[in-house]
Amino acid sequence: MSFVIVARDALAAAAADLAQIGSAVNAGNLAAANPTTAVAAAAADEVSAALAALFGAHAREYQAAAAQAAAYHEQFVHRLSAAATSYAVTEVTIATSLRGALGSAPASVSDGFQAFVYGPIHATGQQWINSPVGEALAPIVNAPTNVLLGRDLIGNGVTGTAAAPNGGPGGLLFGDGGAGYTGGNGGSAGLIGNGGTGGAGFAGGVGGMGGTGGWLMGNGGMGGAGGVGGNGGAGGQALLFGNGGLGGAGGAGGVDGAIGRGGWFIGTGGMATIGGGGNGQSIVIDFVRHGQTPGNAAMLIDTAVPGPGLTALGQQQAQAIANALAAKGPYAGIFDSQLIRTQQTAAPLANLLGMAPQVLPGLNEIHAGIFEDLPQISPAGLLYLVGPIAWTLGFPIVPMLAPGSTDVNGIVFNRAFTGAVQTIYDASLANPVVAADGNITSVAYSSAFTIGVGTMMNVDNPHPLLLLTHPVPNTGAVVVQGNPEGGWTLVSWDGIPVGPASLPTALFVDVRELITAPQYAAYDIWESLFTGDPAAVINAVRDGADEVGAAVVQFPHAVADDVIDATGHPYLSGLPIGLPSLIP
């Protein structure tokens, strides 16, 4: 066989279609089993009983034949899926060979590993799984792990179905992940094996992601092809030894999926990316604190969702800030939190502009736990402040000292907050309305501490003391500008302009970036230990090492750049000092 042309996407789609047909037939057989195998006699006479017994016997024979046919059908679908995966692996091998021919030393090492180490091991394992002896012994070999863990020891994962679109995981010791059903993700391998191929997208849908390769060695699965107008699915990643899977082909009008990340030690593939999407376009976000609430008036800690509404004064404040903001519009979007007070504060501006605010949980106030409804000026109020203040100083791992808080530490809080900011950014680019000042601007209504802590943890010109010396008042605004990729700059704080970072502030940010990376890495590794998934643990360790390594490498360059670029800008001027009122 010198030349073979195979439409691998069509082959994978055919396997998914056959699996769907099999699922439908099996469902019909099961639905007909009870009424046909247990036919009730029409009457109490012997003839009726004999006829019922005859029809029941025929039905039981049919069910036995149908079960055998279903087994053959499942085996055929698995073989067809395996064939599609085999062709996909061949394409990966060819692609990596081409990269090696172009002079890529890592690709050459990976090619050698694939050809002389992993390739033979994988081929031998698949031969055993598909051999008559392997199929006969599989129920015995896999019984213990199926009972204890619900997963085969040796074997390939099942193909996804309409009811369960994602491919099943491969055997714990050896086995490839199953192929995804239409739009489903490929299954992950166990210790050794390839990830399953993602399912093809349907009717403009995105192709499924390829499955993750084996914990020790194995290639990521290929992403599923996109439907018409849909993007291809991303290729699955390899963990320690193996190549990342190819991205699925995009449908007409879509784009191809990204190549999966190669193995940590040996492997080729795409690079991991940190951060959100976007094209680097800068936007402005006006963070606006809500109007006065009864809790504010009584100086109580009030953070729980949904919380109280606005006082009469708060409603007046909401209308006043709406009138002021409307004159500076139009806006790309309006956002608020799950708290009633932020929604009531956002409503007047939304009504003036005919817009519907989007609710983002990441804009909720930092949760006070058991300190809820206690006085702000009290030991509870001080303990509530300790953790968030530490977060702004570069220690997000410090826990919230309010028992019962859902924001257990600064890492949890900041990921929710930056997730909300990412959503605001994406929505703003999707509706790039330019405000009166020429910037794409969105308005986000939130609470004092979330606005203050969230901005100080992320802007490149922070001034954490502002949280204590100039807390944001009701309907006060904090303005930031930038994007998730290039970073954010604090433009103004409650109407007071904030200049670029001074040299000490810039150096503080450099140190902050250096010391926060290992904190995030340690927390992610700690969390991964509770998943019980070795792949999750390996990924957390790998991602953490990458993040810490990048921070260490970047630190001296950032310091040198800041020292060279230092120009002595006046940082802050005219900021009044007042009694803190940090808790809304």
From Swiss-Prot:
Gene of origin? PE_PGRS11
Name of the molecule in the record: PE-PGRS family protein PE_PGRS11
Species for this entry:
Mycobacterium tuberculosis (strain ATCC 25618 / H37Rv)
Lineage summary: Bacteria, Bacillati, Actinomycetota, Actinomycetes, Mycobacteriales
Keyword Magnesium part of the UniProt annotation: yes
Where does the PE domain start and stop, copy by copy?
A: 1-92
Catalysed reactions, as listed in the record = (2R)-2-phosphoglycerate = (2R)-3-phosphoglycerate
Principal subcellular localisation of the protein:
secreted
Give one Pfam hit by family name: His_Phos_1
Q: What is its EC number?
A: 5.4.2.12
Induction statement = Up-regulated under hypoxic conditions.
Gene Ontology CC terms:
cell surface; cytoplasm; extracellular region; peptidoglycan-based cell wall
